[in-house]
Regions:
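Internal low-complexity, small-residue/proline-rich segments
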Residues: 1-253
């Protein structure tokens, strides 16, 4: 059912509440637990937080839509294997870090950003619908009309007004166990620490690595190496590093 109707099985509530230090970046002073009201009848739950996000791929085309197979590692019912990393394991991002939500939802005038936008998601489902097949359909709200492919997120930012950091568990990194994209997934659409905010629609969206480290964010690659992706990385290169089978020629980064 809809994300807001999904609640923890009582047996697993202690696990949902658990704070796991290895899932938290020491440089992020954000909350380590969040409260969210879910289900019908509504109940309040506590979630342990998370800084490390698995990649759904480049975010280009329809590869932001984790309901279907993507050019990354993770999607609903994903069955990606190491042999599917045709771009090479050392050239493919598997996970990257993010900044946890600040636990304060706000509604602001269109085009206005909150004081710390990197701690919130721009909740931009207005003007979109699931449509058929991979990818969502736009009909307003700054989104292109028709299938949403490679959208101009600044146009979306200019129209949308809702910023989320915890409502219904819908904040960045508010849980490590609830499998919603804005909580546990990332993609390469936005470069590290981009001034374009992480933008979500219907539980999925357009994200990017974020950290409070100076100059960039860390990423885990398919070969197990951890490398620092600079804020200044070329956007095309960044997206290529997040795809596992795009056939791109990737130089030094």
């Amino acid at each position: 059912g809809p994300g807001g109707s999904q609640v923890p099985n009582p047996v697993f509530i202690p696990a949902f509440q658990a704070v796991i230090p290895s899932f938290l970046c020491p440089s992020d002073p954000g909350p380590v637990q969040y409260m969210a009201t879910l289900g019908s009848p509504a109940q309040t739950y506590i979630f342990g937080a998370n800084n490390y996000m698995a990649s759904t791929g480049s975010g280009t085309g329809t590869n932001y839509d984790d309901r279907s197979s993507t050019d990354g590692f993770v999607a609903i019912n994903s069955s990606v294997r190491f042999k599917d990393m045709r771009d090479g394991s050392s050239q493919t991002v598997f996970m990257s870090e993010a900044i946890r939500g600040d636990d304060a939802d706000v509604t602001l005038p269109a085009g206005t950003t909150p004081l710390f936008p990197y701690r919130k998601l721009l909740s931009a489902g207005s003007g979109t619908s699931p449509g058929s097949g991979p990818g969502y359909t736009g009909s307003g709200g700054g989104w292109p009309t028709g299938k949403i492919i490679n959208p101009d997120l600044l146009a979306v930012l200019a129209v949308q007004t809702n910023w989320r950091a915890t409502a219904g568990g819908n904040g960045r990194g508010v849980t490590w166990l609830r499998g919603l994209a804005h909580s546990v997934l990332t993609n390469g659409y936005n470069t590290p620490n981009s001034r374009i905010p992480d933008t979500t629609l219907h539980g999925t969206g357009f994200f990017g690595p974020r950290s409070l480290h100076a100059g960039g964010a860390h990423a885990l690659f398919g070969d197990g190496s951890v490398r620092f992706l600079a804020d200044s990385i070329d956007v095309g290169l960044h997206r290529a590093l997040h795809s596992r089978d795009g056939g791109e020629t990737v130089g030094e980064f």
